[in-house]
Amino acid sequence: MLTANKLLPQGHGLAPVLLKRAATVELDWDVRQKSRFAATDSTGRELGVFLPRGTVVRGGDVLVAEDGSMVRVVAAPQAVLRITHCTQHGSPFDLTRAAYHLGNRHVPIELRPDHLQIEPDHVLADMLRAMHLIVTEQQAPFEPEGGAYAAGGHGHGHDHPHHDHGHDHAHAHAHGTEACDHEHSHDHDCGHHHDHGQDYGHAHPHSLAR
């Protein structure tokens, strides 16, 4: 197993040609928020990653292995809930309210100009629909905010220029619609009952203990 214990945020200082040639490794958020984990890169090499505690790995970062080789991290698509405001019965300000309430619950949130993303949670989904918001399930990379005082991070809490997903979140599974269907009978669920019964636990056998 090849050991990697150095991280270059967004490949800082590396020539673009080196980044293109580097092997890649796809990691979801559950793994990337850990400082120690195992993974397999695009060439089939087994990696043991040992970073300083508190380090958060973002898509576009580069891991440097003990032999000097580099591995570029790709934020893997994963199950997320995409939250948008209801144009018929709400306003864009509803997203601000949603972010406030989710933040009070210490929920990891990815903030985008026109929507929010969180990890699947049927209780939170019901709460958000009750606030006139549209909640749809999809597969997409997840890059939540790191927090203004996040320790050990490397400044990804607010710049996020690296969302080169290349698919504009085209992986929506059509579990919801973009129009609010309720008749304003005060149930305010926008007609989206997404109780699919999934167990949203994510087992990642590659993760090592912190």
Curated annotation (Swiss-Prot):
Localization per Swiss-Prot or TrEMBL: Cytoplasm
Nucleotide-binding as a keyword?
Answer: no
Q: Which GO terms describe its biological process?
A: protein folding; protein-containing complex assembly; urea metabolic process
Region spans: Disordered: 144-210
Q: What's the chief localization of this chain?
A: cytoplasm
Q: Which InterPro entries match?
A: UreE, UreE_C_dom, UreE_N, UreE_N_sf
Q: Which CDD domains match?
A: UreE (cd00571)
Query: What are the Basic and acidic residues biased-composition ranges?
Result: 156-202
Under Gene Ontology molecular function, one entry of this record is: nickel cation binding
Record's HAMAP family?
A: UreE (MF_00822)
Q: Which family does it belong to?
A: Belongs to the UreE family.
The name this protein carries in UniProt is: Urease accessory protein UreE
